[in-house]
């Protein structure tokens, strides 16, 4: 049994450390998917279980609490699409409770911390926990000045223009409001509006949305505020950030004031004085849940007195005076009608169950996630059997679970109801979007086959195309000034043939297509004559490009900047590189061996590159690209007499005489290999001020450490 599965009380200290490392990474990954990408892969119940296990291990082994522990962190880092906003007061998360006993413990803890006896009554508020996107809206002198998402709790994303389109949120406050007001609450999409939007999408032949929460979050992150306005988003106010003056001295009074200022507040909020009353209201809200026109995943309890809230204070990432009482997962039995495959922006093929409509928790469910091919077969993430090894087949009667109002999932199969004629599901070997090969890679770290099946279509797969284009123009690839994420989205979505950019070659034909078009880019909002002229100049400057940048820009899986340089240096010209990849297609022979023998490449990378070139449409796109650009012959490092040729070098800390990129380029030109991490194979660590764990590791492995000046002296300035 692995450390991730073993009961907490049975863990050794070493196993606990390993489990905490795994949980920190897994929770951070899911935080990014939920808060950053609005695309959760697991249910709230599964996520909460991960966090509870992390907290339990930390409680038993307090000395092992990590710097990156989920118990010290809120949400996920803000995206780079919107400008960052630092919150005047952090937007913290709430601790969760899952049972009546947990709620009783929470209330008892409040009394204990304050030194109150049970007969010294403390009032609490109880309100539905809205399943939406947390928002902080700032007003100064009665006018809205900014709106930001939660982000990581400290820094969020500036979405002011989009928030202004939500009719329920006032643009100005009445004369009696304080000079500085930060209203916090939840942006959400009503169930009725969500169903209407999906009906519209289906009528237009477009893919429907998964659930109201993700749709609301995605709508709010639109670069075009007109799209946000069309989505009919709504808002509930329930908290505050910075306030120059407080209109009330209780939680209940503050929310009442928000309502008087014109903000929507939840009508189910109550002020209660006992655990029994709190739990009764929880049950009452649970009964009303199916009839509400918005998704909720629990009930939030808060100490009502602001004075007592201040005395209770905060833990590292949550207040002591509040908790969220989550609803349990809800299940129902229905028939699996079909399995569809959706392709994500990274090329991942995700199976989606199409179900006979069934009501789960008051909501009609017709789709459910099936995660990946192994999940369908009855195999877990670590190769262990799940559902006692029972596979899932089309036609099966299945148990569907809906936890926390997120995407439902199939948790079990009723074998007794399986028809004798049923057959095991065959996961597709080609991409349903573009027809390219679909493969399961070998994980470099574990050596095992990944659970995720990915499309190898690259450039030509529409599902991946925009992300590939953004990578293509990124700083270490083509680095085209004026062509960022926002512009790529605009060009990709355009229906005008003179403006469309669907593949990399389209970037370089844009100016020619515009010359013969009546619809000029310079006349479109956000561009203008000067910026368009600069954009064309920036594109034309990149027609000649270093070979390693060209290879990196192709977006081949596992090929990062360093690997691209190794490949460029080994093959010299693009013609030789492409010919070598095609000759290596059988994964055997001299060309395959040559590729595998490049130091720093290895079989996983080699296989990924060869698979990319086995796809005819990738080769076709590259052929068109080569009509427009000229990859330059790779410069071979002048290593004659170099004291660092063949050595592995790591730079850490601050460098004063070079940028990190300049130092790296110089070392590589002298025949050194520059690495981002220290290992026993590292030869030299160049440490500047602020060097941290890499310097410690270098000393641990007895690696030669030198200052920047000593390094310059070694290489001759």
From Swiss-Prot:
- What positions constitute the catalytic site? 129
- Which Gene Ontology MF annotations are present? DNA binding; DNA ligase (NAD+) activity; metal ion binding
- Binding of Zn(2+) occurs at 431, 434, 455, 461
The record lists NAD(+) as bound by: 44-48, 93-94, 127, 150, 186, 302, 326
The record's family statement is: Belongs to the NAD-dependent DNA ligase family. LigA subfamily.
Task: Tell me the function of this protein.
Answer: DNA ligase that catalyzes the formation of phosphodiester linkages between 5'-phosphoryl and 3'-hydroxyl groups in double-stranded DNA using NAD as a coenzyme and as the energy source for the reaction. It is essential for DNA replication and repair of damaged DNA.
Q: What is this protein called?
A: DNA ligase
- Species whose genome carries this gene: Rhizobium rhizogenes (strain K84 / ATCC BAA-868)
Provide the organism lineage as a comma list: Bacteria, Pseudomonadati, Pseudomonadota, Alphaproteobacteria, Hyphomicrobiales
């Amino acid at each position: 049994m692995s450390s991730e599965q073993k009961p907490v009380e049975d863990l050794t200290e070493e196993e606990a450390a390993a489990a905490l490392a795994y949980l920190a990474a897994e929770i951070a990954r899911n935080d990014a998917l939920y808060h950053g990408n609005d695309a959760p892969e697991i249910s709230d119940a599964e996520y909460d279980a991960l966090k509870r296990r992390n907290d339990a291990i930390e409680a038993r082994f307090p000395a092992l609490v990590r710097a990156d522990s989920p118990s010290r962190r809120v949400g996920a880092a803000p995206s780079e699409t919107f400008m960052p906003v630092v919150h005047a007061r952090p937007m913290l998360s709430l601790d969760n409770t899952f049972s009546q006993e947990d709620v009783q413990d929470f209330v008892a803890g409040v009394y204990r911390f304050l030194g109150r006896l049970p007969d010294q009554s403390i009032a609490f508020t109880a309100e539905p926990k809205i399943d939406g996107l947390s928002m902080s809206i700032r007003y100064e002198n009665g006018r809205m000045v900014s709106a930001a998402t939660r982000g990581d709790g400290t820094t969020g994303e500036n979405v002011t223009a989009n928030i202004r389109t939500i009719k329920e949120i006032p643009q100005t406050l009445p004369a009696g409001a304080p000079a500085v007001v930060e209203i916090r609450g939840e942006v959400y999409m009503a169930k009725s509006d969500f169903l209407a939007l999906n009906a519209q999408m289906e009528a237009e032949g477009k893919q429907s949305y998964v659930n109201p929460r993700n749709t609301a979050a995605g709508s709010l992150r639109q670069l075009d505020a007109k799209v946000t306005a069309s989505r009919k988003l709504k808002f509930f106010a329930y908290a505050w950030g910075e306030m120059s003056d407080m209109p009330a001295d209780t939680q209940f009074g503050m929310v009442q004031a928000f309502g008087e200022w014109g903000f929507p507040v939840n009508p189910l909020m109550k002020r209660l004085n006992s655990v029994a009353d709190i739990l009764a209201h929880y049950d009452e809200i649970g009964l009303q849940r199916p009839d509400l026109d918005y998704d909720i995943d629990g009930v939030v309890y808060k100490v009502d007195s602001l004075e007592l809230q201040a005395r209770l204070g905060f833990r590292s990432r949550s207040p002591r005076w509040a908790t969220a009482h989550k609803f349990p997962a809800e299940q129902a039995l229905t028939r699996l009608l079909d399995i569809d495959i959706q392709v994500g922006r990274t090329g991942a093929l995700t199976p989606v169950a199409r179900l006979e409509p069934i009501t789960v928790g008051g909501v009609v469910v017709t789709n459910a996630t099936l995660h990946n091919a192994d999940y369908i077969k009855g195999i877990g993430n670590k190769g262990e059997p799940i559902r006692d090894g029972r596979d899932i087949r089309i036609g099966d009667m299945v148990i569907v679970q809906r936890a926390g109002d997120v995407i439902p999932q199939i948790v079990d199969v009723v074998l007794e109801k399986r028809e004798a004629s049923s057959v095991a599901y065959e996961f597709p070997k080609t991409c349903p979007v573009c027809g390219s090969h679909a493969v399961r890679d070998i994980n470099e770290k574990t050596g095992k086959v990944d659970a995720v099946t990915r499309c190898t279509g690259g450039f030509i797969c529409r599902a991946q195309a925009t992300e590939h284009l953004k990578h293509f123009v990124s700083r270490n690839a083509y680095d085209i000034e004026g062509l960022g994420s926002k512009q790529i989205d605009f060009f990709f979505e355009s229906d005008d043939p003179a403006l469309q950019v669907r593949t990399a070659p389209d970037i370089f034909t844009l100016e020619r297509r515009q010359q013969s078009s009546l619809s000029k880019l310079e006349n479109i909002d956000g561009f203008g004559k000067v910026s368009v002229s600069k954009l064309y100049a920036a594109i034309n400057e990149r027609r000649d490009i270093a070979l390693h940048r060209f290879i990196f820009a192709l977006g081949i899986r596992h090929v990062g900047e360093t690997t691209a340089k190794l490949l460029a240096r080994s093959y010299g010209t693009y013609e030789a590189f492409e010919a070598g990849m095609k000759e290596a297609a059988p994964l055997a022979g001299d060309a395959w061996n040559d590729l595998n023998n490049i130091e720093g490449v290895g079989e996983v990378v080699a296989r990924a590159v060869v698979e990319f070139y086995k796809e005819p449409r990738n080769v076709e796109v590259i052929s068109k690209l080569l009509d427009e650009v000229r990859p330059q012959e790779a410069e071979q490092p002048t290593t004659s007499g170099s004291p660092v040729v063949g050595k592995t070098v790591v730079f850490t800390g601050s460098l004063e005489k070079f940028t990190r990129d300049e130092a790296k380029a110089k070392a590589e030109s002298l025949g050194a290999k520059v690495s981002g991490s220290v290992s026993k194979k590292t030869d030299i660590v160049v440490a500047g001020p602020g060097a941290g764990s890499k310097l410690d590791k270098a000393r641990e492995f007895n690696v030669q450490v030198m200052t920047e000046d000593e390094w310059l002296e070694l290489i001759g300035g």
